[in-house]
Design a protein with these regions (language model features):
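Beta-sheet repeat architectures centered on beta-propellers
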Residues: 1-203
Length: 203
């Protein structure tokens, strides 16, 4: 059904270390499937309704489907002044004991950031694909936050590591956390996550 819609394109973006495939769904909506050229990991970009992509001086640009406006991609800390909505969904893991039931209780994502990102975690079990329902909350960070901490009193840091434990619950053989949130005016990089569980009997 999408084959007749204008906007199908692939492009290699060396500066971002990924290749991008633009998939138009309608004349106004598009998604991008992206593969990391170093690790081979895949992800999906949504909310970028793009008609075409191009490189200029190594930077990535796109033409929007609504009105022919050209934007510079992969830059800044907001989506044209709006929040950037993001979602992380790692691969399912048996956590070293395939065939055993587990009771999952806590999850801790590791972010490198210069702010305090609000996020929520929903747990997917045994290859399920649930819609996230938890409300994002902001963790407590030890470093000073711009426009919040007092000048000359806060300990300033270019980037800090957010390692807040979040309560989750589920019983299953394998699991994958869906971590989602929205950010504006801060940088954010996800590096890993930890999980706490109790191992039960084999099934």
């Amino acid at each position: 059904a999408y084959s007749t819609v204008f906007g199908w394109q692939s492009i290699l973006y060396p500066q971002g270390s990924y290749s991008l495939f633009n998939i138009p769904r309608t004349s106004l909506l598009a998604d991008q499937y992206v593969i990391n050229s170093q690790t081979g990991a895949w992800c999906k970009f949504t909310g970028q309704n793009v008609a075409c992509w191009s490189l200029f001086n190594g930077d990535l640009y796109f033409g929007a489907q609504d009105g022919g406006v050209i934007y510079k991609a992969d830059t800044g800390t907001s989506d044209n002044s709006a929040d950037i909505d993001w979602k992380i969904r790692p691969a399912f893991s048996y956590f070293g004991s395939r065939g055993n039931q587990k009771i999952f209780s806590l999850c801790r994502p590791h972010f490198t950031t210069n702010g305090a990102p609000a996020f929520a975690i929903d747990l997917n079990l045994n290859f399920s694909n649930i819609n996230p329902t938890n409300v994002p909350t902001t963790p407590t960070l030890s470093a000073a936050i711009w426009d919040t901490s007092k000048w000359d009193e806060g300990v300033w840091a270019d980037e800090v590591t957010s390692q807040a434990w979040t309560t989750v619950f589920g019983i299953g053989e394998c699991a994958s956390p869906t971590i989602r949130g929205n950010t504006n005016s801060i940088t954010l990089s996800f590096t890993a996550y930890d999980m706490i569980w109790q191992t039960g009997s084999s099934i």
